[in-house]
């Protein structure tokens, strides 16, 4: 990743778009597909890079910034549940300095003179849930989703052993929140069952828990060894407790499972001592944890601190460092992606790291192999932090044997044997044979049917491979005639290995359902290099309809300077992406495919919908010293109510809140005739909204 200190504004603008797109993709894979694409450490690095860029260039913060989002949007196969109180995720800290900064921010925000107790508890590596009780009866269970809308998993949550369906002495309305997980031993047994049944094994306990809870058939969930802890409250008709430690005691009294491992810390030293204790003893716990959660214990102080876009100010998660292991590198294989990029993959002597058997690891690119001097036959260090494919972090040179061999990048594509070329600026090797390369064609079809694209359920990796091998499909367009082809065939798909009448029927129904597709999904499904979900949405907002999109692409292909400049001015669409778009539309097969698809699909025009509130768009300015509020708390309250807080007064300002020694801003507000109030009036205004 680039050095943030040296990056200029233009580079930052492009990088923020790229990060938003990449993080959105990783969020969807983690929260919705339950199949993380990168390690926790790599994700955290990307997220923190995004935060640092936003801190340096606050005027470049995007509407779809990852720092404003929680989780990922829910799928259509479950009913949607709106969270009355948003289910936010936690910010992360990674060392003692970060923790001290977190504690200092609390003292500064609340203007505290002394340490306020912090409740510390293990961060369970599972799936977050919310359960609502009305008059003591469980009525709704939901996933976090995007933090505002989750999936209805009521039927599934009721199958969990000892999860209360009814609670006594409960308030009229109570929403509890917690984590659903699978213990390590149960996870091992579950994977053994999966293997015996010829099914794919789960990558880790978190994925197993999430996949189990998101089953359409609750009887499948009932067979899975799910457990839960509750640790927070979403909403309630009456106050249950005044602090986190009191709340857990109340939950236990009501019959919920709570994690008994928790500590009320009265100093920094006690916080760090508890963290070290859990880090050392995590291997002895029956379940996976990936850090320690710190919460301001006093609920009244929590309320004052409030939230930022995606997380509470009063809590954070102190993550454990990644788990390291060592094993032998047996060979290096090469994978060809949908855009022709070749990725080296390490094939390893199987090793258990953190309860998961690892036999493959990513090597990223060929420059990375050379930089780390990784050789076949070496003993390599692996880093795993909850990911599917861990990373190789280095080589144990002391164990290097004389016959360890260097790996030379291939000159020809392993799939189609065409000559490869090196792209220096991207540090990659690429096959440019496009759809004539079997590997690229396969990956392109896989991308086309994926959840974020056309979302055709029932066409997974194995099914796509099978249909291509049997000659039933050779490109995305063929998918929409699969039913007709099957009806005309003497050998029916439902009679072939791995298929059945029901699965084929469901597949055809899902294909039919996918024919109604939004324009951004369609653009993303095309698989244009560097055009991810966010950039597809940018293009959609610009063009509005499929017809206009195609017309503008034709002009772009003809090097129309006006359309080129228009697109180049869009945040995140730079010269490099425009070249990729032009290259894509220069390929005759791509144009034919798009034309054919447009004849069988209903590509919906773009419609922008935004929720409005009474304060949406109001611009307020705080100036001077407030008697009771810190500037941070005042700003947070305003933003929570939908206002935009500006640093200076202008003719666009709607309201100025003036404290002592207000100075030039107050003077300018008076000159412009802008409404001015003091802190007391502001607090009254806030209370009455």
UniProtKB/Swiss-Prot annotation:
Q: What is its EC number?
A: 6.5.1.2
**A cellular component term (GO) from this record?**
cytosol
> Which reaction(s) does its UniProt entry say it catalyses?
NAD(+) + (deoxyribonucleotide)n-3'-hydroxyl + 5'-phospho-(deoxyribonucleotide)m = (deoxyribonucleotide)n+m + AMP + beta-nicotinamide D-nucleotide
Quote the NCBIfam families the UniProt record gives. Answer: dnlj, PRK07956.1
> Would you tell me the protein name for this molecule?
DNA ligase
What does the record list as GO biological process? DNA repair; DNA replication
- Family assignment from sequence similarity: Belongs to the NAD-dependent DNA ligase family. LigA subfamily.
* Classification via InterPro entries: BRCT_dom, BRCT_dom_sf, DisA/LigA_HHH, DNA_ligase, DNA_ligase_AS, DNA_ligase_CS, DNAligase_adenylation, DNAligase_N
Q: Where does NAD(+) bind?
A: 40-44, 89-90, 121, 144, 179, 295, 319
Task: Read off the Pfam families from this record.
Answer: BRCT (PF00533), DNA_ligase_aden (PF01653), DNA_ligase_OB (PF03120), DNA_ligase_ZBD (PF03119), HHH_2 (PF12826)
State where Zn(2+) binds. 413, 416, 431, 437
Top-level EC class: ligase
Per its Swiss-Prot or TrEMBL entry, what cofactor is needed? Mg(2+); Mn(2+)
Which parts of the sequence belong to the BRCT domain?
A: 610-689
Reply yes or no: does the keyword Nuclease apply: no
Q: What is the lineage of its organism?
A: Bacteria, Pseudomonadati, Pseudomonadota, Alphaproteobacteria, Rickettsiales
Q: Which GO terms describe its molecular function?
A: DNA ligase (NAD+) activity; metal ion binding
Biological role stated in the UniProt entry: DNA ligase that catalyzes the formation of phosphodiester linkages between 5'-phosphoryl and 3'-hydroxyl groups in double-stranded DNA using NAD as a coenzyme and as the energy source for the reaction. It is essential for DNA replication and repair of damaged DNA.
Enumerate the active-site residues: 123
